[in-house]
Amino acid sequence: MTGRIHSVETMGTVDGPGMRMVVFLQGCPMRCAYCHNPDTWNETSDDVKFMTVEELWDQYERNRQFYTNGGITVTGGEALMQIDFVTELFTYFRERNVHTCLDTSGICFDPHQEVAYRKLLSVTSLVILDIKEIDPDKHLWLTGKPLEPILGFARLTADVGIPIWVRHVVVPTITDNADHHYRLGFFLGSLKNLQAVDCLPYHVMGTAKYKELGIAYRLEGIPAATKDLAAKATRTVVEGIKAYRR
């Protein structure tokens, strides 16, 4: 089986524990207003590479000495668009005692295909889940997609018991609503498998790609978020988690 690969980063340090090989898959159904990789949206691209599990393993092996406390992370694009390939990839790596991390929005989750998702999670060591917004209407505006599949996927990870880290990007005037952060925390409090929450400050470093691709940037004029704003959001999310767990 081959996967549609956008790129491979051999020395990733922010996509899971330790040093990791990070595989960026091509294709994503979401159109997040602040996405910094719009070149991964389309399933086909002139730059897409088709790689087998064995080819990715060979690439991992060449740098394995650096991955002692790390492993492999698959992200995107949206990794779940190629769930069969990711399942095969993770199975292969787990059989060789490599830590596997799935970085996803969860948007592709379909409860009617739960067996396939459970199979993937059975060979996943860690899930990093990006929750863009907890308000359904705001989420639809921000991403072009509904919120419920994402929450459903989060609940499934809890049911399976896979450790989960949650990320949320704080965008000034867009996702910096304290009430929404509290509600996000209240939902996360229901996930017994939650290990970490990270509210990240929005940045504008990806805007040049939009100009290159001829795509209008919907957040034009909105400034980057400060670290203080992101830290404040994290504190509010934690308050919501604690409130649920009282």
Residue ranges, per PLM feature:
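Conserved AdoMet/S-adenosylmethionine-binding subsite of the radical SAM
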Residues: 57, 61-71, 76, 80-200, ...
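Short glycine-enriched, charge-decorated loop/helix-capping segments at active-site entrances
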Residues: 39-46, 140-146, 214-222
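Auxiliary Fe-S-binding modules of radical SAM enzymes
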Residues: 2-17, 170-246
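Canonical Radical SAM [4Fe-4S] cluster-binding loop centered on the CxxxCxxC motif
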Residues: 7-9, 13-51
